[in-house]
Amino acid sequence: MKTSYIIHRTLYLLACLLLMCGCGNRDYDKIGKTEVTIETDRGRIVIRLYDDTPTYRDNFVKLVEQGAYDGAVWHRIVRDGFIQAGTNDEGKYVGNTLPAEIVYPTHFHKAGAVAAAKEDDDVNPDRRGSNTQFYIVTGKVFTPGSLAELRQTMADADTLHGFAPFTELQKRVYTKRGGAPHLDGAYTVFGEVVEGLGVVQSIGHEKTVDEKPVHRIAIKRVSVTKR
């Protein structure tokens, strides 16, 4: 009797695990099917690129296939914010900025979000993004109170330019997983980390001076691993 219970219990748990894995894959397939793997000297990061930001997806894939990020470095770390990188030769690859594809609030700055860097709004009111510089959000976890306070501060400063209050999903993610909500609606988020968020967070805790890492953190190789 006891053995039978254990077997049935084990089968039930395995079924639940398979169901959760299947749902996770379907969820990722809904946002996009292109995956890029970033091999760093701290570990591997896999990102999924969004289909509804096609300009940035295609631009990133093009640069990756040209080897533009192989041998580059993470050159900027903002604590509780993000880690940023560019190409291995900005003079060779930098070009025109890309038109904004801000799909907000569908895509927001949760931990692991991948977005394009850009100039400040005062010189770039159309919020065009860099064609080479990108960042991955590390962020921090908020309490409901601190998140509401931040939202009010953002509204008072008009940094959201009339965008709606945080959705229930945003509130849940920012208070459980964390992120950088103060960046929402201002930058094009074009992908997210699906594997290796711990590596991203580890890089985000590296020692810095004026947001520059004290130790070199290399990107060994970047490749398109799934389409």
Language-model region placement:
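Bacterial N-terminal signal peptides that target proteins for export
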Residues: 2-12
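Cyclophilin-like peptidyl-prolyl cis-trans isomerases
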Residues: 22-227
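Helix-centric, low-specificity signal for extended rod-like, repetitive segments
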Residues: 1-2, 19
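Bacterial N-terminal signal peptides
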Residues: 10-20
